[in-house]
Regions:
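Conserved S-adenosyl-L-methionine
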Residues: 28-34, 138-140
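Rossmann-like NAD(P)-binding element
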Residues: 57-118
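N-terminal Rossmann-fold NAD(P) dinucleotide-binding loop
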Residues: 19-20
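Rossmann-like NAD(P)(H) cofactor-binding subdomain of soluble oxidoreductases
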Residues: 91-157
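C-terminal substrate-binding/catalytic lobe of Rossmann-fold NAD(P)-dependent dehydrogenases
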Residues: 137-143, 152-317
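Conserved N-terminal Rossmann-fold NAD(P) cofactor-binding segment
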Residues: 34, 38-76, 90, 309-317
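A short, basic/flexible loop-to-alpha-helix module at the beginning of a structural domain
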Residues: 1-8
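Glycine-rich Rossmann-fold phosphate-binding loop(s) that bind the pyrophosphate
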Residues: 15-16
Length: 317
């Protein structure tokens, strides 16, 4: 992290449901002493800053304020949540053109100020927008990445924990590829405290392993659609994912997280942004981790990359 960076300062661009929930989660985390909220609707940003600030007597001292792009120059992390929200029955990829247009107004503002912090993309479709952000900012790839399938992987762990009646924190499993309809469960590497998932299922008395696993995979994939159908938007889960990623950066944890970044020679995939586990620390992505995948998973990953590549080819960036 650069000397010109305040390692205890974070900026959140976009104060809709996801941005404000992320800001609240970051306030509670104790990771930062300063937070700037930016939104095209300045009144909304000011209102969120005030509302969250009123909870500070129950947390830790910090400065929270609405601001503009000049206020983010020394931020250690710039979280970008701004964008149109996903509507019922709308896929994340349906949001592409609307949110690319929004990013064309946001990312150049960050770039022209020579910000040296980490750019964490959260807006959807996160894989496409992360690649757009890399191109528009000109920043090194390690400093620009997306929340990716961090939330999807948490959903997978939660559902597996419920199914197997075990603490979700003991479940180690990844969702990889697109944060969207072509995402893949890396079942071949999934385990519960070192015990392969299929063996653990048998140990818990579940014999219809394939059937249950397919049901859980679909449950993860449909989670967002189900929530949006019921309450119009998802925001608490992703806010916790944002907090977790920021924690790994600020504490230089070198944690392995399934974030979205441009892939290089990942099972033959080159130059496409999607989620794979990566080591995350104070300088962003330190190294991509190539986990073992079986042939079926490798083919599904290539198919996911192909779908994203097709969308990218149609964009004017």
């Amino acid at each position: 992290m650069s000397k010109g960076i305040n390692s205890r300062k974070v900026a959140v661009i976009g104060t809709g449901f996801v941005g404000s929930s992320s800001a609240f989660a970051l306030m509670e985390s104790g990771l930062f002493t300063e937070m700037v909220l930016i939104d095209a609707d300045k009144n909304r940003a000011e209102g969120e800053a005030l509302d969250i600030s009123h909870g500070l007597p129950f947390a830790r001292p910090m400065k929270i304020a609405a601001g503009d792009y000049d206020d983010i120059v020394d931020a250690a992390i710039i979280v970008v949540t701004a964008g149109a929200g996903q509507k019922p029955r709308e896929t994340r990829l349906d949001l592409v053109k609307k949110n690319v247009a929004i990013f064309k107004s946001i990312i150049p503002e960050i770039a022209k100020r020579n910000c040296e912090g980490i750019l964490l993309i959260v807006a959807n479709p996160v894989d496409i927008l992360t690649q757009v952000a890399v191109k528009l900012s000109g920043f090194p790839e390690n400093r620009v990445f997306g929340s990716g399938t961090t939330l999807d992987s948490a959903r997978l762990k939660y559902l597996l924990g419920e199914h197997l009646q075990v603490d979700a924190r003991s479940v180690h499993a990844w969702i990889i590829g697109e944060h969207g309809d072509s995402e893949i469960v890396a079942w071949s590497s999934a385990n519960v405290s070192g015990v392969p998932i299929s063996e653990f299922c048998e140990m818990r008395g579940y014999t219809k392993h394939d059937e249950h696993m397919e049901e859980i995979a679909q449950g993860v994939k449909n989670s967002a659609y189900k929530i949006i159908e019921k309450k119009k938007a998802t925001y608490y889960g992703v806010a916790m994912a944002v907090r977790r990623i920021c924690e790994a950066i600020i504490r230089d944890e070198k944690s392995v997280l399934p974030v979205s970044s441009i892939q290089h020679d990942t099972y033959g995939i080159e130059g496409v942004t999607l989620s794979m586990p990566a080591i995350v620390g104070k300088d962003g992505i330190e190294k991509q981790v190539k986990i073992k995948l079986n042939e079926k998973e490798q083919e599904a990953l290539k198919k996911s990359a192909g779908a994203l590549k097709k969308v990218l080819a149609d964009l004017d960036i």
